[in-house]
Amino acid sequence: MLETRDLSIRFGGHVAVNAVSCAFAPGTLTAIVGPNGAGKTTYFNLVSGQLPASSGSVWLGGRELTRLGAAERTRAGLGRAFQLTNLFPGLSVLENVRLAVQATREGRHQRGMNLWSVWSDHQGLTRRAQDILASVALQARADDAVSSLPHGDQRKLEVALLMALEPQVFMFDEPTAGMNAAEAPVILDLIRRLKQDKTKTILLVEHKMDVVCELADRIVVLHNGSLVADGEPATVMASAVVQEAYLGVAKEAA
């Protein structure tokens, strides 16, 4: 179970996220929505450790993560898809994913392996990386340098690297942004498949409400940094507070 308890952050006198408390259970996909400037990405940054909270806390599986940095939270089971800033651009797509798989599996094998064990492990890492690339339709790009990828394939690689981490929690911030009509369905299909694993928790920031209503089991609405609605998609989207805050529908005069 992922939880945030009264999670807040202030920038000077501005409260960007205001005491947001939420619990996200395994086997669910929660979409976090709201107008521009609502605090969605800032909230994501607080959860993943990219920003330090001014107050409140983050918990995963009963363990407090608030004082941990982003890398430590990743090791604890939080996985977030990021722009390609921490890769080896001169290496191939396959090599980058294989390194991510290897890093994830460090410590799972006994030390002092013989040469045959080392070779077998290398082969296993390669097969796992190839399987991940196939799942995001990137197998044809396996030998290409990361720096040569077009935008749509970069987004696919972000998801591939997230899968290599084998996290308990998958965090997607607008995963299809900038992708064309042929590319976006690949990522959405992958998220649907991830959703079938009832041991995983998925958080999704997404502006496309047709995608949200199709994929989400639950919608959390932020407005001016505060949680203003939380529930099943049909109920939340029909509520007056969401019509006003998120959709910008003005109140009718009495």
Regions inferred by a protein language model and the residue ranges of each:
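Glycine-rich phosphate-binding loops of nucleotide-dependent enzymes
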Residues: 1-254
